[in-house]
A protein has these predicted regions:
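Short beta-strand edge/turn micro-motifs at domain boundaries
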Residues: 160-186
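Bacterial N-terminal signal peptides
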Residues: 15-27
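Sec/Tat signal peptide C-region and signal peptidase I cleavage site
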Residues: 27-33
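Short hydrophobic alpha-helices and adjacent helix-cap/hinge residues
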Residues: 34-36, 60-63, 196, 203-207
Length: 224
């Protein structure tokens, strides 16, 4: 069934990967849980719609739009997002085959660095708005994974958007967003693979710590 949500977000991904907190790996709060009151699991689509609706409430809050409330607004957005994105899964997929070669300690360090990279990439775009509708077209599920199909209805063109989610303990969490064929995870993986090939994994970590990694996240990435 097609569902439409009116919204004022230029790019959903600007918000979905804005949070810079590894606490995104913790359990969701009751208001964001993807189970119904009787304990029955809801769909991945409902999880995405719930997240968008919560974000819209914050973005449309006139009090939080005041300049002196900028930090509070950002905090409230982060509180929503950190319960809805699986940063570990995202980092694992972005690093690709190199992930399995790392120790648990190095994996944790990489997740920390990756989340900070996401935050640096998207932090400046949080105020980008335009009146759009999100039309949910359906979802595909295979075991613990789901692909929620949607369209952003623009004034001139419609843009296909896929939300990719993984189920963790009866909760659906986003680990990638594909906008008009451009996957955020794939673009990071392409860049990371190139840096590792040229410099080694240690070189990649060094560049991430120096904030010297720049990825055009909404462009279709070439094969690594």
């Amino acid at each position: 069934m097609t569902t439409i949500i009116n919204m004022k977000i230029k790019s959903l991904a600007h918000l979905l990967f804005f949070s810079g907190m590894v606490a995104g790996l913790t359990m969701a709060s009751p208001s964001l849980a993807t189970t119904t009151p009787n304990g029955i699991e809801s769909s991945a689509t409902e999880a995405v719609k719930g997240t968008i609706n919560d974000l819209i409430q914050v973005l449309d809050d006139e009090t939080l739009k005041q300049p002196e409330q900028a930090e509070e607004r950002r905090h409230e957005i982060e509180e929503i997002i950190k319960h809805r994105v699986d940063y570990e899964e995202m980092a694992k997929r972005a690093l690709g085959a190199h992930w399995s070669t790392l120790s648990p300690r190095d994996q944790h360090e990489f997740v920390d660095l990756f989340v900070q990279l996401l935050r640096d990439t998207f932090v400046g775009r949080i105020t980008e708005h335009s009146d759009e509708q999100v039309v949910f077209l359906g979802e595909l599920r295979e075991e613990a994974f789901a692909d929620v199909k949607a369209q952003m209805k623009g004034r001139k063109i419609d843009t296909p958007v896929d939300f990719r989610l993984i189920r963790r303990a009866h909760e659906w969490r986003v680990y990638d967003v594909v906008i008009d064929g451009a996957s955020i995870v794939s673009n990071y993986r392409s860049q990371f693979t190139s840096i590792i090939r040229d410099l080694s994994y240690v070189g990649l970590v060094k560049k991430m710590k120096q904030k010297a990694v720049a990825v055009k996240v909404f462009e279709k990435s070439p094969a690594p």
